[in-house]
Amino acid sequence: MSALLGLRPEVQDTCISLGLMLLFVLFVGLARVIARQQLHRPVVHAFVLEFLATFQLCCCTHELQVLSEQDSAHPTWTLTLIYFFSLVHGLTLVGTASNPCGVMMQMILGGMSPEMGAVRLLAQLVSALCSRYCISALWSLSLTKYHYDERILACRNPIHTDMSKAIIIEAICSFIFHSALLHFQEVRTKLRIHLLAALITFLAYAGGSLTGALFNPALALSLHFPCFDELFYKFFVVYWLAPSVGVLMMILMFSFFLPWLHNNQMTNKKE
């Protein structure tokens, strides 16, 4: 602690924010271990693990936004953190989606029952709201000059383009990410996690300045809940409907349209 106090205020703030993010990861990791040992009912087990995974993702992303403001002159710093914590989430949250669109994809493709999907969706939404209360309590302690309670209560609109472009950006980001998620399943786990982290970083770089490139309805609800209250229709369409449409388009293309096109070509060749 004395070593931390000897640093410049800006460096102190950065270290505190990074420390909080690592504490979230350690807390959730410990809670997941306990849940695996103590919870044996599949539904309760799935709910708790999905709740914890979404909680970690949302809390870390809240703090990541703070870090991006601390060194806004160097955008590569933010991208580096996005890549690093995407790796951390990928390694520590195995077996969970932390994204309603991911659950929807699994249900449509038959990898998850509707009942289990509903349980996971409920866990994600409840966790997204709980993470806001946790972050609000932490920020009220004013551990850094960027931590203040009013910050989480205000609507900080992340949409910096017209609505039609915002919808397209979120839909395309969701399409690309879930396409990779589907087609990287056969890739070795360690390599897959790096590839997905790199893709998330690229999408954040490409669309982050316009919409935040969230492509995750639960995360959007946690980060921008006051905006959903004030501008519900706009935020519902951009951050909930558009990513869902992106996933549906991806499933239609890779599961129906491309196989149909391939079968037609094979039939024509035989004729």
Curated annotation (Swiss-Prot):
SUPFAM superfamilies: Aquaporin-like. The keyword Cell wall biogenesis/degradation does not apply. Pfam families: MIP. GO terms for cellular component: cell surface; cytoplasm; cytoplasmic vesicle membrane; endoplasmic reticulum; endoplasmic reticulum membrane; plasma membrane. It is a multi-pass membrane protein. Highly expressed in the S1 proximal tubule segment,. Expressed in the testis, kidney, and liver. Weakly expressed in the heart, brain, and muscle. Highly expressed in the testis. Expressed in the proximal tubule of the cortex of 8-day-old mouse kidney. Expressed in retina specifically at retinal Mueller glial cells. Expressed in brain. Expressed abundantly at the choroid plexus but also expressed weakly in the parenchyma. Expressed at the capillary endothelium in the cerebral white matter. Expressed in adult testis, in the elongated spermatids (ES) and in residual bodies inside Sertoli cells. The keyword Membrane applies. GO terms for molecular function: glycerol channel activity; hydrogen peroxide channel activity; water channel activity. Residues 36-41, 98-166, 216-234 are lumenal. It is found in: Endoplasmic reticulum membrane; Cytoplasmic vesicle membrane; Cell membrane. InterPro entries: AQP11/12_channel, Aquaporin-like, Aquaporin_11, Aquaporin_11/12, MIP. Induction: Increased by glucose. Decreased by phlorizin. It catalyses: H2O(in) = H2O(out); glycerol(in) = glycerol(out); H2O2(out) = H2O2(in). A motif (NPA) lies at residues 216-218. Disruption phenotype: Homozygous Aqp11 knockout mice are born normally at the expected Mendelian frequency and are normal. However, after 15 days mice begin dying, and only 15% survive until day 60. Mice exhibit severe renal dysfunction with a significant increase of blood urea nitrogen (BUN) level. The kidneys are large and pale with rough texture occupying the whole abdominal cavity. The kidneys are anemic and polycystic following swelling and vacuolization of the proximal tubule. The chain crosses the membrane at residues 15-35, 42-62, 77-97, 167-187, 195-215, 235-255. Keywords: Cell membrane, Cytoplasmic vesicle, Disulfide bond, Endoplasmic reticulum, Membrane, Repeat, Transmembrane, Transmembrane helix, Transport. Residues 1-14, 63-76, 188-194, 256-271 are cytoplasmic. Belongs to the MIP/aquaporin (TC 1.A.8) family. AQP11/AQP12 subfamily. The NPC motif is essential for oligomerization and water permeability function. Homodimer; disulfide-linked. Homotetramer. Can also form homomultimer. This is Aquaporin-11. It comes from Mus musculus (Mouse). The lineage of its organism: Eukaryota, Metazoa, Chordata, Craniata, Vertebrata. The gene is Aqp11.
